[in-house]
């Protein structure tokens, strides 16, 4: 038998655990021949592609070759390797930077490459784990069961009997990524200021942010920690499955985790044959995605079909936690608010939320933007919220970005990608799926039951417009929230009354009293309609208990604050 191929020699760059632009620059300044050779390869590839685009313009055949050129770009990025595949995937979330025909093709960019040599993979396992492969695993597949741009996966069994997936990183990956990032950073420094891009930041900083995320993704210890944090967030949720990490068989370039028995979400026939209801899988996927964004703020940024499974017992399983991100607390509440503003068609409030989220600069003149949003979103939503389609909204919004000073913050590029992907997966299971039927009841319930000051402020902002109470909005929110079978109105009512009678609820008490008597009449009709919505959820004794629990700690001194002060 021939001797196995040796692993590539260890590079200085393998010792850089976190992205460090200065350390990478110092390394390649001493090795200009490596930089020159890779630069020639990249420039030649893109030069030929750009020449084709120019030729299409000169010959008036842009429309004829539009689809072909988009496919050429996808194939070019795949050929240039892992870094450029990741760049293409990042650009597929940026409708403010990439025209639609290229965007649609980049979305198809698969994070797949042919597997690398098994001998190299097993050598890397032994080097990382400090033991022979047959000492770590009782059994292991002879060939990888999956291969991607950054690594490949084997199926194995531990001596204790657990089935596991063993994820092994591609050899020499860190130096390859570092060289491409160094070239991108050089290009950003030299040419970034000449590019007509609405980025909101210096292009060099964007390359650095991309490098930070890429280095996090190739640190398998970091991925394991992400998986455990994700599992902790969903602890007690019987509908979401997260694989266990086996730390004694894991290191920076090898990760051993629980093998998930189930079906990819694209295997609709197998899902149905197993007796699983696709509509339940869809509901779990959308709800868990919303919980990540609006409750935990820690979200899976790469939910493509290979990373989501329906388990045999009907749960949603997440795998591959290399690409995760964290939202700030205030951002979660603003996202919830913007969804409600969109459904309520309050485009002034929606524009203000866009400013708060960073889609628009604070000094932007929003006067022409409000009717533009109404034109785009109004037609996309249609006459009913049931017509809401996130992909349509995203496509129409991408057109708007070329005419107005919108930019997509990096975090929201990942969120948009995540939501579009999840909606696409849901539609593959059920072509009649409407994301709003799951999402809006959850958001309404989240606002109605939120205990944080930020969520309470958002609820007040939604229910009051120009100082007037919006009875119809409260009625809509209660009606839609009750369509969620998990919504329990009793705790919500108790929370609401506790807040209403608290010191923080002073403003709300006064506004409700004014709302009940505004326009010189008592608004008994509105109150009766709302009572008609909720009365079936209350028994008389329960209602008394809720009211008593809310007011029993309310001081006599606080009674005077219920009434408006003269």
From Swiss-Prot:
Q: Which domain of life is it from?
A: Bacteria
MF terms in GO: ATP binding; protein kinase activity
Note the SUPFAM superfamilies from the entry: Protein kinase-like (PK-like)
**Signal sequence coordinates:** none
Gene3D superfamilies (UniProt xref): Transferase(Phosphotransferase) domain 1 (1.10.510.10)
The protein's matches in InterPro entries, at most eight in alphabetical order, are given as: ABC1_dom, Kinase-like_dom_sf, Prot_kinase_dom, UbiB_kinase
Q: Which family does it belong to?
A: Belongs to the protein kinase superfamily. ADCK protein kinase family.
Please give the name of this protein: Uncharacterized protein slr1919
- Organism source for this protein? Synechocystis sp. (strain ATCC 27184 / PCC 6803 / Kazusa)
């Amino acid at each position: 038998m021939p001797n196995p191929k040796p692993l590539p020699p260890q590079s200085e760059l393998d010792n850089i655990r976190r992205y460090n632009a200065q350390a990478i620059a110092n390394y390649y300044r001493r090795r200009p021949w490596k930089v020159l050779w890779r630069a020639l390869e990249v420039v030649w590839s893109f030069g030929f592609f750009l020449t084709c685009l120019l030729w299409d313009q000169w010959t008036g055949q842009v429309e004829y070759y539009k689809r072909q050129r988009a496919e050429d770009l996808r194939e070019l990025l795949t050929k240039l390797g892992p870094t450029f595949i990741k760049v293409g995937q990042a650009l597929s979330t940026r409708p403010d930077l990439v025209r639609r025909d290229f965007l649609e093709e980049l979305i198809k960019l698969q994070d797949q490459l042919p597997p690398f040599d098994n001998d190299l993979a097993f050598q890397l396992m032994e080097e990382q784990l400090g033991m022979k492969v047959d000492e770590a695993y009782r059994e292991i597949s002879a060939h990888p069961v999956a291969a991607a741009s950054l690594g490949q996966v084997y199926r194995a069994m531990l001596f204790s009997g657990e089935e596991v997936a063993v994820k092994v990183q591609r050899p020499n990956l860190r130096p390859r990524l570092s060289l491409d990032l160094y070239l991108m950073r050089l290009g950003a420094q030299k040419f970034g200021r000449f590019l007509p891009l609405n980025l909101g930041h210096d292009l060099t900083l964007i390359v650095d942010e991309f490098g930070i995320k890429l280095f996090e993704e190739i640190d398998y210890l970091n991925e394991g920690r992400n998986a455990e944090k994700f599992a902790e967030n969903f602890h007690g949720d019987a509908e979401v499955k997260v694989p266990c990490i086996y730390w004694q068989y894991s290191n920076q370039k090898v990760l051993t985790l629980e093998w998930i028995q189930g079906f990819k979400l694209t295997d609709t026939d197998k899902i149905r044959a197993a007796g699983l209801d696709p509509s339940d899988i869809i509901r779990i996927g959308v709800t868990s995605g919303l919980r990540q964004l609006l409750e935990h703020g820690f979200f899976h940024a790469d939910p493509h079909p290979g990373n989501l499974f329906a388990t045999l017992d009907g749960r949603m399983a997440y795998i591959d936690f290399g690409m995760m991100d964290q939202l700030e607390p205030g951002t979660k509440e603003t996202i919830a608010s913007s969804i409600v503003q969109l459904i309520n068609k309050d485009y002034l409030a929606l524009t203000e939320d866009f400013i708060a989220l960073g889609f628009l600069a604070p000094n932007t003149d929003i006067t022409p933007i409000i009717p533009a949003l109404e034109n785009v979103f109004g037609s996309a939503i249609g006459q009913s919220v049931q017509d809401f389609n996130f992909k349509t909204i995203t496509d129409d919004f991408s057109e708007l970005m070329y005419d107005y000073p919108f930019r997509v913050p990096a975090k929201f590029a990942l969120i948009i990608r995540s939501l579009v992907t999840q909606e696409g997966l849901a539609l593959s299971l059920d072509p009649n799926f409407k994301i709003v039927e799951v999402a809006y009841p959850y958001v309404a319930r989240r606002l109605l039951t939120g205990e944080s000051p930020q969520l309470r402020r958002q609820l007040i902002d939604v229910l009051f417009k120009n100082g007037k109470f919006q009875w119809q909005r409260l009625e809509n929110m209660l009606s839609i929230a009750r369509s969620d079978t998990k919504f329990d109105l009793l705790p919500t009512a108790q929370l609401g009354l506790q807040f209403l009678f608290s010191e923080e609820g002073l403003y709300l008490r006064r506004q409700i009293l004014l709302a009940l008597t505004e326009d010189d009449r008592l608004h008994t009709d509105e109150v009766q309609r709302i009572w008609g919505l909720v009365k079936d959820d209350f028994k008389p004794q329960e209602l008394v208990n809720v009211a008593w629990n809310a007011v029993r700690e309310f001081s006599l001194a606080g009674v005077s604050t219920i009434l408006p002060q003269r």
